[in-house]
C-alpha cells in the first residue's frame, strides 16, 4: 500500500460536543495509506448496512490508491510519471475526469495551483534533506520542465500527452480532498447525514445526530466552524522545514519562481477553505499558501469569492 506525502495536511479535527446521553450514530474508523480516517453517520446503521458501508469505503480507498497515489509505484499516475515518451497516453475515465477538474483549478487559481511541479519538488526535497541546494543548472532544467502548459489533454480520445519528457504530475495538493468527495458520495447510499474526515480534509452532509450542524476546529482560525452540506480543506507551511546556509526552507514551492518558500519571508502558517467540493477547497487552500502575506492572500480570496480562513505568524 502506498502513502501520500503529508506536507499540506493535517490541521483539522472533528469537534463533537458531548452529552450525558449521546444520540444514536455509527462510526467507521481506520487508517489508509498511512493516514487515519473517521466517518460518522448521523443514525445507527443495521449490521448489514454497516458491513456494506465498510466495503464501499474500502472500495473508494482502493480506487484512490491504485489510480491517484503518487507514492504507490503501481498506481496509474506513477506509471504516467515514469513515461518519458511524448506520445498520447490513454487514461482511465476516472483519471481523465480528475485531470479535467485540475485544469479548471489551475485556471481559477491564476496558475498558483500547479500539479506539474512534482519533479521540481522532488529535486528540492532530495537536496534539502541533505542540507544542500540544487545547482542553478538543475534548477533551470527542472523549472523549465514544469508547468501545466506542458500537459495536453485530448477530450475526444481521453489521452494525455507530455510536451516535455521530464514533466511529472504531483496530485497531493488536491487528491485527499477528491477522495473525501468520493467517500461522501459512497456514504450517501446509506445515510443523508454524515461527516467524513481523512487526514484533515472534511466533508459534511445534513446534520449531526444531536440535530445541530457539524462542527469542526481548524488551525487557520480560533473559531469553531459549523458546516452544513459543505467541505473544508486546510494547507499549512509549518510542518516541514529544512535549514541550509542560514536559511530555513518550507516544503511549499512558489509556482512563480520554482523555489521553496523561505520561512523568514513567508508569514502564512495555515489556510482553510470552505466549499461544496472538498477537492476544490483543497486546491485553493494549497494555492493560498503561496502568497507572500496574509493580506495579499485574503485580497485574492475575496476577489475569487472564496470562503477562506488564514492565520499567520502575527496571530496573537
Swiss-Prot record:
Molecular-function GO terms, alphabetical: metal ion binding; transferase activity
**What EC number(s) is this enzyme filed under?**
2.7.1.180
Q: Does the keyword Cell inner membrane apply?
A: yes
- Does the record's keyword annotation contain Nucleotidyltransferase? no
Record GO cellular component, one term: plasma membrane
Q: Which Pfam families match?
A: ApbE (PF02424)
Tell me which residues bear the S-diacylglycerol cysteine lipid modification. 20
Name the positions where FAD binds.
Answer: 33, 71, 112-114, 170, 176, 253
Subcellular localization, per the record? Cell inner membrane
Lipid moiety-binding region (N-palmitoyl cysteine): 20
Q: Which residues of this UniProt protein bind Mg(2+)?
A: 173, 282, 286
> What keywords are annotated for this sequence in UniProt?
Cell inner membrane, Cell membrane, FAD, Flavoprotein, Lipoprotein, Magnesium, Membrane, Metal-binding, Palmitate, Signal, Transferase
Leader sequence residues: 1-19
What topology does the record note for this protein and the membrane?
Answer: Lipid-anchor
Specify the protein name. FAD:protein FMN transferase
According to its UniProt entry, this protein's organism is: Chlamydia trachomatis serovar D (strain ATCC VR-885 / DSM 19411 / UW-3/Cx)
Amino acid at each position: 500500500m502506498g502513502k501520500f506525502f503529508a506536507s499540506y495536511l493535517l490541521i483539522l479535527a472533528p469537534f463533537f460536543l458531548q452529552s450525558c446521553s449521546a444520540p444514536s450514530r455509527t462510526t467507521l474508523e481506520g487508517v489508509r495509506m498511512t493516514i487515519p480516517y473517521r466517518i460518522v453517520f448521523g443514525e445507527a446503521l443495521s449490521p448489514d448496512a454497516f458491513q456494506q458501508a465498510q466495503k464501499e469505503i474500502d472500495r473508494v480507498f482502493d480506487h484512490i490508491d491504485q489510480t491517484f497515489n503518487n507514492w504507490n509505484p503501481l498506481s496509474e499516475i506513477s506509471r504516467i510519471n515514469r513515461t518519458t515518451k511524448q506520445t498520447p497516453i490513454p487514461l482511465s475515465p476516472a483519471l481523465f475526469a480528475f485531470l479535467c477538474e485540475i485544469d479548471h483549478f489551475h485556471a481559477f487559481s491564476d496558475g498558483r495551483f500547479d500539479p506539474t511541479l512534482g519533479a521540481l519538488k522532488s529535486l528540492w526535497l532530495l537536496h534539502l534533506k541533505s542540507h544542500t541546494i540544487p545547482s542553478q543548472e538543475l534548477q533551470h532544467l527542472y523549472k523549465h520542465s514544469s508547468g501545466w502548459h506542458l500537459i495536453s489533454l485530448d477530450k475526444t480520445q481521453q489521452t494525455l500527452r507530455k510536451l516535455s519528457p521530464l514533466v511529472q504530475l504531483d496530485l497531493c495538493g488536491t487528491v485527499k480532498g477528491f477522495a473525501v468527495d468520493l467517500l461522501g458520495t459512497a456514504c450517501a447510499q446509506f445515510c443523508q447525514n454524515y461527516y467524513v474526515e481523512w487526514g484533515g480534509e472534511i466533508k459534511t452532509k445534513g446534520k449531526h445526530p444531536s440535530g445541530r450542524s457539524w462542527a469542526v476546529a481548524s488551525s487557520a482560525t480560533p473559531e469553531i466552524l459549523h458546516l452544513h452540506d459543505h467541505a473544508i480543506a486546510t494547507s499549512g507551511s509549518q510542518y516541514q522545514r529544512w535549514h541550509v546556509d542560514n536559511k530555513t526552507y518550507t516544503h511549499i514551492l512558489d509556482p512563480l519562481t520554482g523555489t521553496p518558500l523561505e520561512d523568514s519571508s513567508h508569514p502564512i502558517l495555515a489556510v482553510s477553505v470552505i466549499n461544496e467540493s472538498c477537492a476544490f477547497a483543497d486546491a485553493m487552500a494549497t494555492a493560498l499558501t503561496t502568497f507572500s502575506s496574509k493580506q495579499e492572500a485574503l485580497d485574492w480570496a475575496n476577489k475569487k469569492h472564496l470562503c477562506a480562513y488564514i492565520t499567520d505568524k502575527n496571530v496573537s
